[in-house]
Amino acid sequence: MTHEFTESYDVIVIGAGHAGVEASLATSRMGCKTLLATINLDMLAFMPCNPSIGGSAKGIVVREIDALGGEMGKNIDKTYIQMKMLNTGKGPAVRALRAQADKSLYAREMKHTVEKQANLTLRQTMIDDILVEDGRVVGVLTATGQKFAAKAVVVTTGTALRGEIILGELKYSSGPNNSLASVTLADNLKKLGLEIGRFKTGTPPRVKASSINYDQTEIQPGDDKPNHFSFMSKDADYLKDQIPCWLTYTNQTSHDIINQNLYRAPMFSGIVKGVGPRYCPSIEDKIVRFADKERHQLFLEPEGRDTEEVYVQGLSTSLPEDVQKDLIHSIKGLEKAEMMRTGYAIEYDIVLPHQLRATLETKLISGLFTAGQTNGTSGYEEAAGQGLIAGINAALKVQGKPELILKRSDAYIGVMIDDLVTKGTLEPYRLLTSRAEYRLILRHDNADMRLTEIGRDIGLVDDERWKAFEIKKNQFDNELKRLNSIKLKPIKETNDRVQDLGFKPLTDAMTAKEFMRRPEIDYATAVSFVGPAAEDLDAKIIELLETEIKYEGYIRKALDQVAKMKRMEEKRIPTNIDWDAIDSIATEARQKFKKINPETIGQASRISGVNPADISILMIYLEGNGKAHRKY
């Protein structure tokens, strides 16, 4: 079929949420002429649910996005109202940053960034169809009948695909926050042959700040110690005038109100069909599933400096409006609270992610990429991370360059994508530190050391960032080398000082680095014995040194595991493999291999239901069958 295109682009990104913004900024910064199409320009990078960025695992993803040259970290550092480091009492592998955002300012700042970006056109329009010829993307069709040519298309539609809002017995077609749903595109994605799933998520009510009795709640302040999501942010710019959050709880009266109205709850009445998030359940679901709990935490989170709206985290619900009011008024501190917005549930279509490659390109259609909630994830950070990788690979494909695949040992983003494309997901997927087997090397503090060189190679890390990174890396390497070269001897003068500090004396000579491996010896103590570095070191470099030195043994073990897995990842599986021709593999493994079509032995080994014997048989088969080949 011959199309008459009115405009032509290298890449078209459909949807301007957190995934779409990162995808379009990446492609345009890599030199591709890009169109970012959105149903509503006023909702670019909008936060329809929680007014926050980061958190456990998610905060590390934001650091990874920043290290690669993405935008989310820089944008939240410009627009937060509170910053807090989580899990400080635990090991470095699980520490992560979380920020309360001024949600309106966050969206405005991101829109300014997009509007100023070269090679990027921003357009309010609805895309109804993906145009495909001979298994390849050639463009898109708008609702007004315009056809735009494209060499690659990235679908980042969030919860808009056949979206339906549910509130009590009310159910109507809508995207998030009463925006337009994208119904025709949902139909056409299915017609293209993609398998579609149906998920559900929800949001809590918002209450008016001036109607809250804060005396009945517990204050939750931000941190005084400076922390940032972006490696380019300066401590001098750290916000001093932070806005606190507040903690309260449900109670038996709250639970009684919910239990008495379960018959009106869409989750239990049969109105909701989609699968909801396991790790962010509605309050009615929590009351039923955890009936033995006397109370549940609720955090009152301001949505910005210039609004009275307060987000009641932990109270996600689709109960009828009158029940929501009664529920709010049963809670300590909210007895007279004014509900400004009701909570609601939203159902939406997703593209089942086992149909994707690790580049986030669909296996079915060349040049078609999907990212974010479209792939079945939950959360702004997961969406942004996928959007960045999809955008990078769309640009690389257009330019005829090698693709970028982040491995599980490279980044949490790599863990997430591998989980999605290898295991799929039966519910909205959320990143957790427990999903990462190499989490000690995927830390908050070393994201730039892991990923900035990759960002530079693909063209997303500019000269200013690269220079700052090189300075930091050289300072780190030089100081590590110095600490490993200076020796402390068990002489009387040294041991007297060690004992004066309350520590065990030295029995053998050791390097300053070995001295620092003692749990009680921090960097400041070590340099008091061996002298300071040649130049003043930033606190973040010192933190990195302490972690790398104190956990060196564990880190080395993790790197050994990575090396073993790398050998399996390098063993490719051909696309034209005949799974039925492989004798002796288990029926379940054969079925999973056919469905997932793994690209490497490593990926095949991570598919649920596949055992080591199946992998051994597969490897023997591949060694004896050299004719097959994989190509995209």
Swiss-Prot record:
GO MF assignments: flavin adenine dinucleotide binding
SUPFAM superfamilies (UniProt xref): FAD/NAD(P)-binding domain
Family, similarity comment: Belongs to the MnmG family.
Main localisation: cytoplasm
4Fe-4S listed as a keyword: no
UniProt-annotated location(s): Cytoplasm
HAMAP family per UniProt: MnmG_GidA (MF_00129)
Subunit structure: Homodimer. Heterotetramer of two MnmE and two MnmG subunits.
The name this protein goes by in its record: tRNA uridine 5-carboxymethylaminomethyl modification enzyme MnmG
This protein's UniProt keywords: Cytoplasm, FAD, Flavoprotein, NAD, tRNA processing
GO biological process: tRNA methylation; tRNA wobble uridine modification
Ligand binding (NAD(+)): 276-290
Reported cofactor(s): FAD
NAD is among the record's keywords: yes
Residues binding FAD: G15, A16, G17, H18, A19, G20, I127, S182, Q373
GO cellular component: cytosol
Described function: NAD-binding protein involved in the addition of a carboxymethylaminomethyl (cmnm) group at the wobble position (U34) of certain tRNAs, forming tRNA-cmnm(5)s(2)U34.
Protein source organism: Streptococcus pyogenes serotype M1
InterPro entries in the cross-refs: FAD/NAD-bd_sf, GIDA_C_N, MnmG, MnmG-rel, MnmG-rel_CS, MnmG_C, MnmG_C_subdom, MnmG_C_subdom_sf
Pfam families for this protein: GIDA (PF01134), GIDA_C_1st (PF21680), SAM_GIDA_C (PF13932)
Species classification: Bacteria, Bacillati, Bacillota, Bacilli, Lactobacillales
